[in-house]
Amino acid sequence: MSKKQGKPEYVTAISNRKARFEYEILDTIEAGIELLGSEVKSVRLGKASLSESYAMIHHGQVWLENMQITPYEHNTLDTLEPKRSRRLLLHKAEIMRLQSKISEKGLTLIPLKAYFNKRGVLKIELGLARGKKLYDKRETIKNRDAKRQLQQLRKQY
């Protein structure tokens, strides 16, 4: 069967693949994000990136920094800056809990995944993370390679 030409392909999730390699994820939390209509359309088309982005708490609000959203090509209004700060929507108690945990040395908020829930609302999965040391990263690579070799051996036999 042939695919319809006029309908665009929608992406269900955008992930930050480097985050789990470079950080040890201690806890995860789901947050909403405040976007404009043209930005939502771009994210639905998969024109967004979470690499090198992070979240910070400023004046009791959580902000997502450096999330790249390419401007929507059919937007007739003025274009927005692709890497502007975007507000994340959390309950005040959750923000206070995150603030107390972030005040510990070495912890940060990293976006792990952006996805649309069942109602079609864009959500960001944040991870409370601690940076890995170089030897931890090497160990991760070693474990990944060992798993890959086991999978290849299983396929052969």
Curated annotation (Swiss-Prot):
Main location (coarse class): cytoplasm
Localization (cell): Cytoplasm
A GO term, aspect molecular function: RNA binding
Alphabetized InterPro entries for the sequence: SmpB (IPR023620), SsrA-bd_prot (IPR000037), SsrA-bd_prot_CS (IPR020081)
Disulfide bridge map: none
CDD domains documented for this protein: SmpB
GO cellular component terms given for this protein: cytosol
GO BP annotation list: trans-translation
Alphabetized UniProt keyword annotations: Cytoplasm, RNA-binding
Superkingdom classification of source: Bacteria
PROSITE patterns associated with the record: SSRP (PS01317)
Family that this chain belongs to: Belongs to the SmpB family.
Role: Required for rescue of stalled ribosomes mediated by trans-translation. Binds to transfer-messenger RNA (tmRNA), required for stable association of tmRNA with ribosomes. tmRNA and SmpB together mimic tRNA shape, replacing the anticodon stem-loop with SmpB. tmRNA is encoded by the ssrA gene; the 2 termini fold to resemble tRNA(Ala) and it encodes a 'tag peptide', a short internal open reading frame. During trans-translation Ala-aminoacylated tmRNA acts like a tRNA, entering the A-site of stalled ribosomes, displacing the stalled mRNA.
Protein name: SsrA-binding protein
Encoding gene per record: smpB
